[in-house]
């Protein structure tokens, strides 16, 4: 009881990974015992009518894969797979007439070779980094650069244009407001009020 319950957490992750292999066993369904069998597990103890085994094979069994004795007599089928990848356990659902308590510790169970999956299938695959693409990078880096240059050119021209306006040379040419710009800048306004402005008004009269 404790073994089965204690490993249910691990079983969840394991089961999710191995369900892909479950469909594979259905594709290769065969009648009768296989021609050859390989060692799959060693008996540990019975649990709720099932057999709990420690895997002695480097590969992982399919769910529902038939399990045999060495003489190819079928004992049952793989029911659950437990534990981490480096220490795999599994349970056997006994067939009709087979008692889990009739086995002793160390008894071996067997499986057909086509009911096994390589353990590498369940290991995380490293990310493959592709070769750099210098052509694409050059195009990408060149486009923003050109844009930046154009933007700077626009910014520069605006700055210069505004500077001219602020300096009153252009504005003055347009509507005489250069004198205002200059007057705001300092001495010219005072002078214009004191002299030029008065003289000009006098001239108009």
Swiss-Prot record:
Intracellular or extracellular location(s): Nucleus, Nucleolus
Domain of life: Eukaryota
Free-text description of this protein's post-translational modifications in UniProt: Methylated by HMT1, forming asymmetric dimethylarginines (DMA) within a domain referred to as an RGG box, made up of repeated Gly-Gly dipeptides interspersed with Arg and aromatic residues.
Residue location of crosslink Glycyl lysine isopeptide (Lys-Gly) (interchain with G-Cter in ubiquitin): 77
Positions of region (RGG-box 1): 4-21
Record keywords: Isopeptide bond, Methylation, Nucleus, Repeat, Ribonucleoprotein, Ribosome biogenesis, RNA-binding, rRNA processing, Ubl conjugation
Any further remark recorded for this protein: Present with 5730 molecules/cell in log phase SD medium.
Protein name: H/ACA ribonucleoprotein complex subunit GAR1
Lineage: Eukaryota, Fungi, Dikarya, Ascomycota, Saccharomycotina
Gene: GAR1
């Amino acid at each position: 009881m404790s073994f089965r319950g204690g490993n249910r957490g691990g079983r969840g992750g394991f089961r999710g990974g191995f369900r892909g292999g479950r469909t594979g066993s259905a594709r290769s369904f065969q009648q009768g015992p296989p021609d050859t069998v390989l060692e799959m597990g060693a008996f540990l103890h019975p649990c709720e009518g099932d057999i709990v085994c420690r895997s002695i094979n480097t590969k992982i069994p399919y769910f529902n894969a038939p399990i045999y004795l060495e003489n190819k007599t079928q004992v049952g089928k793989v029911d659950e797979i437990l534990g981490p990848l480096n220490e795999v356990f599994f349970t056997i659902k006994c067939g009709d007439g087979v008692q889990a308590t009739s086995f002793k510790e160390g008894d071996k169970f067997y499986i057909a070779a086509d009911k096994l999956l390589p353990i590498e299938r369940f290991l995380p695959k490293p990310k493959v980094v592709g070769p750099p693409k210098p052509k694409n990078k050059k195009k990408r880096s060149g486009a923003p650069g050109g844009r930046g240059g154009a933007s700077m050119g626009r910014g520069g021209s605006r700055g210069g244009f505004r500077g001219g306006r602020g300096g009153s040379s252009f504005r003055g040419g347009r509507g005489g407001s250069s004198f205002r710009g200059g007057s705001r800048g300092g001495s010219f306004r005072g002078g214009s009020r004191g002299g030029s402005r008065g003289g000009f008004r006098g001239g108009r009269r």
